[in-house]
Amino acid sequence: MRLDKFLVACAVGSRTEVKNLLKAGRVTVNGKKEKSAKLQIDENIDEIRFDGQVLEYEEFVYYMMNKPQGVISATEDPKHRTVLDLLDDLARSKEVFPVGRLDIDTHGLLLLTNDGQLAHALLSPKRHVDKTYLAQVKGIMAQEDVEIFAKGIPLKDFTCQPAKLEILSTDAEKNQSQIRVTIAEGKFHQVKRMVAYCGKEVVDLQRLTMGTLVLDENLQRGEWRRLTKEELEVLLTSIA
């Protein structure tokens, strides 16, 4: 790997900034000042320091976000803020992208990474990765709806795989229900459309889990953090 590419990947600065830092003698390779941006290094063997601090190269990064409403799950958009706008410069420099998508008015768990292989595995229909949602519903969900979900709902453009519907609470006076839904797919507006098929309406939707990942209750909407070592190991094992 070229030295300048390594330094950019470690978020030392932009390609132009890195070249200036090299000229200023602020970077050392194996204890010697290095000014050539084109120098080929082995990131697994060579010791690279910036202002005396050892730099560690990470090929892949993994972030958990509590996506807020009003933000879209994309890397760029001409009209709306994206989830990348919620990250800091260092995180954005890793060129991460959202794994799957949550609707603009849906909030909750979202994984961002630059690991394309992991993203492909999590989104592959063959793997049937479960995703769990908490929904506030206008209308009273009943046992017959549980059975309809379990059979697989035939929507206009596709038939849903059997899904698990749990009725957490109902309020007849307010004509509302709280439910938990687990699906193995992730089609456009799927949970909302499944509930609508039963004659009710989702008024708030939050994703709680994706595979082995569980939304951190300490993350406020719009906040994010790196996956813990344990979370990452369990996730990688689950798709191996």
Predicted features along the sequence, with ranges:
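Basic, flexible Lys/Arg- and Gly-enriched helix-loop patches that mediate nucleic-acid binding at interfaces
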Residues: 1-240
